[in-house]
């Protein structure tokens, strides 16, 4: 999945000469937390967040400074070193950018012009859908040595039992030679599937026997 498939295209923006009062009004009106700052050609030149506004605002004991604060221009507090994404970036790789930089949103640019925006909320919503967690079902974790072989065998079992696979993920294990396959299947009663897995020699690690399902 790539960024352009999940980004928001209708981006609320500011110019560097807009006042901080304008920024506050837009944050409240559109219920957003991030405002890219663009020039006349929609090049991203900065970013303002609700956190930036709170940190720069006068304290409640300095109300006399508030009117002056509101008339300041956006470029007086905006972040100028803005990390951006490309519409063809992979969502998984962009997730790492969010994590490494500790940011809450990424402007999306094409030919150096702003065309969209991606937030942590967009990413979370996407991963919920990718994992099938938004659909009723059961999660089953299986420890494997050979991913390809195990996937083929387990997929065949699902077909035989008419169990629909919602998603498959591969997790690392403490043993570098082992992986954990995480299946989300569309059934609220996974017991027949779990029993079939065990009969065929697969090591089910979740649900475990102690969970009263097997």
Swiss-Prot record:
Annotated pathway: Ketone degradation; acetoin degradation
Domain of life: Bacteria
A single BP term in Gene Ontology: sporulation resulting in formation of a cellular spore
UniProt KW keywords: Acetoin catabolism, CBS domain, Repeat, Sporulation
Keyword DNA repair: no
InterPro entries, per the entry: CBS_dom, CBS_dom_sf, Diverse_CBS-Domain
CDD domains linked: ACT_AcuB, CBS_pair_AcuB_like
Domain called CBS: residue spans: 7-66, 78-135
Zinc-finger as UniProt keyword: no
Subunit structure: Interacts with YabA.
Protein role: Role in growth and sporulation on acetoin or butanediol. Involved in the breakdown of these compounds used as a carbon source.
Name of this chain's protein: Acetoin utilization protein AcuB
Organism: Bacillus subtilis (strain 168)
Lineage start: Bacteria, Bacillati, Bacillota, Bacilli, Bacillales
Gene: acuB
